[in-house]
Amino acid sequence: MMSNLYTIPKELEPRTQSIYRQRVPRKIWQTMKTNAVPRKMGEWAETWIKLNPEYHYNFVDDDEVIQFIRTNFPGYLQAFERLKHGASRADLWRYLVIYKYGGVYADLDCLCRNPLKDWIDPDAAYVTQLGVNKDVCQWLIISVPGNPIFLRAAERALHNVLNDLASAEYYGFEFHRGKLELRRPEALIKIEDPVLGLAGPPILQEAAEDCFKNQTCPEIFEQTQVVCISEKTSCNFKGKVKHDYGNKDYLEGLKQLHVPHY
């Protein structure tokens, strides 16, 4: 039996009027099995709510995730229901909800340290960081709606599920003179993992590289804000957020919710 639970609000309208211009919709998205979560998760969710009062906050539980896909992307429903790992379901859902509505998606083990209005470029269509493997960020996604990268990621995940595949290959990006470029072929990274290689971060990076190479969304890359570039550890969007991956309280919370970690 779980104790010391925190109830995250399912939806909060903006608590203050926004007086600044920004292309990225002022929407925050988070998800978990249920919104009744261990206190640490609730405290981290509160950082997004309190520091960004001009944003519409949305918490989507497992049942609502399924309803969203059934209503908006019925062609993905069969594959989604075949996904057994909650993380993979959250992966696919985040691509689709950001593609449809845009805004800010944050994992529940990610806390906000600085208001979004202070560091999101008002003209940016896509805001990310480059990770240790020089891949775009998947635990915090900031984008306008209709970004082809996320539809491509969802399509790749769909293909993997329907064909029992769980692998990915990517090169990673370099950032020179304000522009993203693909790294050299010898930088190829190969991933084989039943969760990560199904719909996880490597799939998003593959999708981004597909769009980059095929020039299917040049305007997105021209208007991408790369906040920082990670080296040995995550640069955490230049300290504007903190991805506390592996936090013992968070891991214990997942156990309480009977949710596996990856």
Annotate each predicted stretch with a short phrase.
Residues M1-A90, A106-Y262:
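Glycosyltransferase-associated regions of secretory-pathway enzymes
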